[in-house]
């Protein structure tokens, strides 16, 4: 608090579903504290943070920090609603003066009061009527209950009055590192970054793997995929966000020898799954949506999944339309990067007539024709793990 009771701008972030965790709530809040501390360190933010039962409060916010803090807390899993507020002690004269500054440029106003301190002398209804009456008598400002030009929200805590200046939604979910580890198959397209982000929001620490081939990929393509990983992880602020780049060139040449060209994409994606599973994450994430492309029919997905029977694969987009996925990609901020032109491995490798009803017996027979797939997979994974 500054001299002369100057208002202190704070940021209130409510926990959302963390409050419902019962005996485990403290574990989730403890991890949220670690995540906020890590993010603040990366972003060189030194503001004090007070952790309360159902929310955290960032103090001493200056105007130049608002955009940075909003960008962080909009994306930080575990938080629901966030509020910037002016904080003053229980001084009604100062509260009225600040309210007058907020509403004076508007033709009408409405006051809403939330009394978090139930021992405060007035109840919420009586206090908002009192404030509105005082604004009319002192400043001739017109209150209006229906369709006002501005609605001002005031909260009453044990020691302070709060005037809410801005509110925005967090993404909810659970703090990262509370659910385990996940490896996202990142193609560079629209879908996979959205899928990774949705799983990250459920408390997973997400890393990424992408598959490149020569000569279809170059430094620009890899740079694009790295930017997508950075966008999902908020430049490693939300999770570790490591990107594994697997050179698929030799495996692609090996797969080109199969006798049934239409099965090429199915075999390739089985290789992707197998490679990703060898990194021993708790689960894999893919951007597959049912029926969106030939490899994503239910028959093909079952055959692809069969190569990793002991690996849990999360497909958060499985029932979504492309329009909805694009909407989420735009909200996430990955859409413009995703639509930059590049050649992904699936596109380079696509047959003219891909099968949509793959049979496991046929796939296993085709794989038996390939002599070096296992060796190439193990060598490629070992190389990345040792880097």
UniProtKB/Swiss-Prot annotation:
**Lineage of this protein's species?**
Bacteria, Bacillati, Mycoplasmatota, Mycoplasmoidales, Mycoplasmoidaceae
Q: What is this protein called?
A: Probable tRNA sulfurtransferase
Gene Ontology MF, one: CCA tRNA nucleotidyltransferase activity
PANTHER family documented for this protein? TRNA SULFURTRANSFERASE
Domain THUMP positions: 67-167
One GO CC annotation: cytosol
Q: What is its main location?
A: cytoplasm
What CDD domains does the database record attribute to this sequence? PPase_ThiI, THUMP_ThiI
InterPro entries (alphabetical): Rossmann-like_a/b/a_fold, ThiI_AANH, ThiI_fer, ThiI_N, THUMP_dom, THUMP_ThiI, tRNA_STrfase, tRNA_sulfurtransferase_ThiI
Keyword tags: ATP-binding, Cytoplasm, Nucleotide-binding, RNA-binding, Thiamine biosynthesis, Transferase, tRNA-binding
Positions bound to ATP: 185-186, 210-211, 269, 287, 296
Q: What class of enzyme is it?
A: transferase
Q: Which SUPFAM superfamilies match?
A: Adenine nucleotide alpha hydrolases-like, THUMP domain-like
Determine the domain of life of the protein's source: Bacteria
The record's EC number reads 2.8.1.4
Catalyzes what? [ThiI sulfur-carrier protein]-S-sulfanyl-L-cysteine + a uridine in tRNA + 2 reduced [2Fe-2S]-[ferredoxin] + ATP + H(+) = [ThiI sulfur-carrier protein]-L-cysteine + a 4-thiouridine in tRNA + 2 oxidized [2Fe-2S]-[ferredoxin] + AMP + diphosphate; [ThiS sulfur-carrier protein]-C-terminal Gly-Gly-AMP + S-sulfanyl-L-cysteinyl-[cysteine desulfurase] + AH2 = [ThiS sulfur-carrier protein]-C-terminal-Gly-aminoethanethioate + L-cysteinyl-[cysteine desulfurase] + A + AMP + 2 H(+)
Which pathway does the record list? Answer: Cofactor biosynthesis; thiamine diphosphate biosynthesis
Q: What does this protein do?
A: Catalyzes the ATP-dependent transfer of a sulfur to tRNA to produce 4-thiouridine in position 8 of tRNAs, which functions as a near-UV photosensor. Also catalyzes the transfer of sulfur to the sulfur carrier protein ThiS, forming ThiS-thiocarboxylate. This is a step in the synthesis of thiazole, in the thiamine biosynthesis pathway. The sulfur is donated as persulfide by IscS.
Q: Which organism is it from?
A: Mycoplasma pneumoniae (strain ATCC 29342 / M129 / Subtype 1)
Its subcellular locations are: Cytoplasm
Q: Which family does it belong to?
A: Belongs to the ThiI family.
Pfam families with a match to the protein in the record: ThiI (PF02568), ThiI_fer (PF22025), THUMP (PF02926)
Gene name in the database record: thiI
One of the protein's GO biological processes: tRNA 4-thiouridine biosynthesis
Spell out the SMART domains in the cross-references: THUMP
